[in-house]
Amino acid sequence: MTIPTYSTLHIEYDQGVATVSINNPPVNVLDVALMSDIRAFLTQVRDDPQTRVIVFQSADPEFFIAHVDMTLIDEPNAFDQFAKDLPNGLNPFQALGEMIQAQPQVTIVKLEGLARGGGAEFVAAVDMAFAAIGRAGLAQCEALMGIIPGGGGTQYLSQRMTWGRALEVILGAELIDALLAERYGWVNRALPANELDAFVHRIATNIAALPEGVTAAAKKVISPADLSEGFLREHKAWAGLFARPAAEKLIRGGLQAGAQTKVGEQDLEQLLRDLSAS
């Protein structure tokens, strides 16, 4: 199979496993370029029988996918180019998660750094996720921007963890470390950082080596529930909050205070809380 060139992704194939390294500096925000590349790659390999497992990782050890590009506040129609391909009722961010879930290959995230907002939703959408103890962190910090998760997070989290824990994650808006993420069900396992690569390589290659049809059968019978009504509720609530002046003020203030920079993203939750308190 010919491997296209992507501006934000580097792809390597080995033993039926496609390893996708995300590289969208400075902090891997989920912007139009990154979403375009991920969608194009998933479409490219969807019907490729030689690709049996997809492992997503980051070229930056500090950040997996920081979150959705906050400059969306200035370009609210930036993602409209994806509208023609969207299933009824889904926004582009929800549609990306559903595209991942519908992928015939097993999808795995190897999480070494931070994933917030849309990045954390990406982690919740894949089939499996494994996180490095002491390095990985997850957060749905949207509440600190005056909104709620709008890319499927409310629905995926309520499947992966209890109702109360999902509310805690969304409304508490705190950075969750790898061990607590494992306990809550956000990731499959938390592993020592020096063991993560070998473990993910082993499980990915073992799955890729299974007899033909086994993976497809397992994914079919262990399929997630129909979340279409939940997505509609989520989008309506998210869009309503996003349009309010309070959200615009917090998002713009966050950008001015250093969000989407390496320094500002280290403790984004506190940066946003300080804005709310001012």
What is each residue range found by the language model?
Residues M1-D14, P61, A173, D177-A178, ...:
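C-terminal alpha-helix plus adjacent terminal tail
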Residues M1-Q57:
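Conserved CoA-thioester-binding segment of acyl-CoA-metabolizing enzymes
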Residues F41-Q44, P92-P104:
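Catalytic-core regions built around general acid/base machinery
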Residues D48, Q103-P104, R244:
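Acidic-histidine catalytic/liganding microenvironments
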Residues E98-E212:
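Crotonase-fold acyl-CoA enzyme core
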Residues A33-D37, P92, M99, F199, ...:
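Charged catalytic carboxylate motif
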Residues V20, F56, D69, F122-A124, ...:
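Hydrophobic/aromatic residues within transmembrane alpha-helices
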Residues S58-A95, A115, G146:
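Glycine- (often His-adjacent) and acidic-residue-rich active-site loop
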